Each structure stands twice: as structure tokens, then as C-alpha cells.
């Protein structure tokens, strides 16, 4: 089961278009890489903390306020993607007379809280209108009696139906850091990308130390 199967199921459920949130992760990786260069390499900050997880951001802001300046100012992939899509469909030519309702499918309930935060609004309107968890989506699919085996897989819709490998690995342990490191490194050859992947950034150890090539 992959995103193409879910695209087919979502269409049966009545969703008009389905996009790939990995693109939002790509935008976030680019933004965090710029933030790192502007703040950490200049010496303004000693380190940078990712802001892609709303539960993590709330933990820092509630329990460790001294680290708030070290939090990236970037939105999460959900926030990035929703803002881009809503802005795209503000163009009357793209909207084609229809109102855009942005529904985000996410694995974590913290994304529901993120969607109603003031910084998740643009022009006074919510960027993400509704958030459903992956568990809730599976229940919807079951309740509608849909069977993945009988659905023809479909590609996500354009122009936002794609994402790079860096965006896809956001969901694994160490993936955000690796995606940012890929963006920071000017050499994007397969050899260098493999070196970054194998440097120790991935894994479930509590504290990880590693060096990466910069060519």
C-alpha cells in the first residue's frame, strides 16, 4: 500500500484532488537550510532546533523557554503545503469558481492543534481547514467498504503531486536533519548523498554525533 493506493481511495471518498506532502517537507528543508546558514554559520546561534513537529515545538515553548530562540521559524510540512495550495487557489483562474477546503492527512493528533494556531493562518484564514489522522482515514475507508485490491492506483494530482527523496525521509528518525544536510551540501552527487545517509544521522540512538562531507 502506498500513496497511489490512497489517492484512489480518497477519490472514491469524494476528495477532488490529492497532493504529496513531501513537497511541503522539501520546502521546509530548503527554509531550514537557509535559517541554519543565516543564524548558525554566522555565529548568531550555537545550534538550530527543527520546528517541523508541533508537539515538539509545544514541548520546547512550555518546558524549555530558554531554547525558543533556537527553534527554526519554518512551518511544518503540513503548514508549508497548506499555505502554498491555498495561495495557488486564490488565483481565480486556478480556483475556477470553487472554494478550496484543505484537508490534511497526518499520523499525529498534534497536527490538529497546529492547524488552529494563529501562525497557521494567512490573510486571516486557516491554511489547513481540517486535519484527519491516518487512523481516521483508514476507518473512513473501511466504513465506505473500499478495498485497496479493487482500486486502480493513481498518481497524485499536479502541480503539487510530487516530492524529492529528502521530503520523503522527513518521516524517519534523523530524516529532517539529513534532508537539511542534503540542501546545505553543494555537491548533490549520488556518492555524496550516500555518504550523508551513512554518516550516522539516521538511527534511534538518544544522542548522535557525526560528521558529513562538504564538497
Label the model's feature ranges.
Residues 1-215:
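Iron-sulfur-associated redox domains of electron-transfer enzymes in respiratory
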